[in-house]
């Protein structure tokens, strides 16, 4: 696969925003895996996790920066962390590679872990129609709650959101249940997660099921902590791409 660093003009503020793009150099259009970096990192964060699977399954891979980390040390942190700027950067990057590269626009998949899981859910609440399937692993779903639950990250939440409860709510997936319900989405969360309590995923799922019981929202609570099981997550992605059939069980 060929790697390129691409710069895409933001349709909000016209700034040039970077993404990494790995593409197959064959002529036919390929499915696209969009990988989202975690809370404390940037576009380089998920190369090790996601590139081997893009190579294995023949996907192109897009790794957007979406204004960098959600840390107080990032001078752009108020435009990161689920802001409209960050969401639009991801959308702009997808639009760019669909228009200019060998990308199959009917088969775009989104994947994020931890802070990237938070952002995957924010995108499900922003433009669910862009994605054939979304995987969100150990996601934060309520920033205001998480600020109180994790002292190591509270100052970063405050820096990104300006210590504004309304802003935290705007940047929390729990606020976008009506739109998230339109997505084809699976949430993965470790039952014993010490970083982002499993209650984040449980509460979001509960809200979705009470209001939209027929939606294509799924939840996998696994035996583990704040971790990634790439095989399980990619099985979900591939099953939605290829229509993998499971064995029917009879009584």
PLM features: what roles do these ranges have?
Residues 98-100, 106-149:
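Primarily recognizes the serine-hydrolase "nucleophile elbow" in alpha/beta-hydrolase
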């Amino acid at each position: 696969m060929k790697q390129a660093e691409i710069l895409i003009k933001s349709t909000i503020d016209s700034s040039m925003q970077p993404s990494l793009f790995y593409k197959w150099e064959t002529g036919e259009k390929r499915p696209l895996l969009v990988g989202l970096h975690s809370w404390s990192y940037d576009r380089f964060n998920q190369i090790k996790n996601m590139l081997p699977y893009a190579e294995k399954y023949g996907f192109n891979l897009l790794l957007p920066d979406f204004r960098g980390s959600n840390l107080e040390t990032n001078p752009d942190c108020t435009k990161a962390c689920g802001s409209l700027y960050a969401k639009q950067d991801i959308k702009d990057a997808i639009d760019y590679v669909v228009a200019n590269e060998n990308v199959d626009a009917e088969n775009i998949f989104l994947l994020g872990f931890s802070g990237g899981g938070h952002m995957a859910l924010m995108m499900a609440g922003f433009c669910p129609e862009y994605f054939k399937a979304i995987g969100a692993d150990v996601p934060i779903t309520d920033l205001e709650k998480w600020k109180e639950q994790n002292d190591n990250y509270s100052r970063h939440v405050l820096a990104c959101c300006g210590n504004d409860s309304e802003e935290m709510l705007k940047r929390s997936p729990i606020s976008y249940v009506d739109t998230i319900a339109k997505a084809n989405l699976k949430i993965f969360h470790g039952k014993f997660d010490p970083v982002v309590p499993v209650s984040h995923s449980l509460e979001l799922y509960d809200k979705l099921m009470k209001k939209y019981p027929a939606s294509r929202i799924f939840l996998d609570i696994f035996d583990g902590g704040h971790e990634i099981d790439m095989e399980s997550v990619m099985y979900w992605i591939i099953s939605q791409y290829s229509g993998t059939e499971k064995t029917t069980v009879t009584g």
